[in-house]
């Protein structure tokens, strides 16, 4: 409740976590953008879910940072969960472009996505990954108010104390 005090938002997150854990090969047709203050514990809140779906080594998780979003290589597309870490486009003009680049990954159709691997021919993979984005920026991406591809929540929780972070 510290990170997501709104009951409806929290219930939606529990539903997402339960569904993807029970149905890892089924697409959740929207992404979650969890924003909040750095060090507040957003990624810690999601850690048990990631472990449940991806295993103790998180082998079926694609971790994507800002630089990788612009890469032609699509290794993360093979994952069950794609994590967009520190989602942020500093320029307003590029925020809309980022949202457009993410559309086919977040929702299906398309049913298939093309994976480019260095030294190999491109191939198609089923578009079933769940996209989870984190940001410390209050405006990390520009999306229209009626876009159903994103479930966005902002945690007002303060930075965790050092003792809390060690638990």
Regions found by a protein language model. Name each.
Residues 71-77, 115-134:
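AAA+/SF3 P-loop NTPase mechanochemical coupling elements
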Residues 103-110, 131, 139, 157:
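Signature of the SF2 helicase/ATPase Hel1-core->accessory helical subdomain module
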Residues 78-80, 127-130, 145-151:
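Short glycine-/polar-rich loops that comprise or flank the Walker A/P-loop
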Residues 142-160:
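A short helix-turn-beta junction within AAA+ P-loop NTPase domains corresponding to the substrate/partner-engaging
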Residues 1-3, 154-167:
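A short, charged helix-loop
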Residues 1-87, 98, 151-154:
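P-loop NTPase catalytic core of nucleic-acid-dependent motor ATPases
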Residues 54, 97-123:
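Conserved catalytic/switch belt of AAA+ P-loop NTPases
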